[in-house]
Amino acid sequence: ENPNADFIPKTYIFGAKAAPGYYMAKQMIRMICKLGDLINNDPAVREKLRVVYLEEYCVSLSEHLMPAAEVSEQISLAGTEASGTGNMKFMLNGAITLGTLDGANVEIADAAGKENELIFGMLTPEVNNLKQVGYHPNAFIMGDDVANAALNFLERGWNGENFHEVTENLRSSDPYMVMADFKDYRRAQADLQRLYADREAWARMSLKNIANSGIFSADRSVLDYARDIWNAPVVK
């Protein structure tokens, strides 16, 4: 709405794959690609925002991306992520995690300190409680002008494209409670913008992530397994 607003230039890089039968995930990828086309070709926006979707994402490609990344967005709904290792690799390379307290994000925050990450969203007990009482995404959408504007924009579409299936999913079922966490996600993004402007503070956070990433080394993992699971003696 205001391309002249004070905004630190950002490039969002999406790299992932969807299972062949996961229709909604395919629609999300389509939406990201079309948004990228729109944003990257808009002269009023493209100097401050870029969107890139990388096809055929793999370990070899990630080896080029991770050393260059400054922020690692790990935004799964609390209680749904099976603790991957990608966020650990980003941490080792100095990226600051912007994410929920889910999966290995919990261990990263414990190791480096929550003050050195950008944490947002519900905790697992809050998610479970909301499921029990009944989750209604529209209750979060109706009171949020930004969420409404974003969904309406996707529904209107552009260049003959619209994303009704995506927005209908968010308005009706929203199984990953995106709308419940959306406002706090924006708060974390605002914190990111403020912190990034302070280069010394940002460098300090980045270095603390690197310095505390040793806990995720393979040597430590193997030692723990040998001691706690296999009961194998240490051989020097």
Where are each of the predicted segments found?
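Long, K/E/R/D-enriched contiguous segments that form extended
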Residues: E1-E63, L77, N231, K236
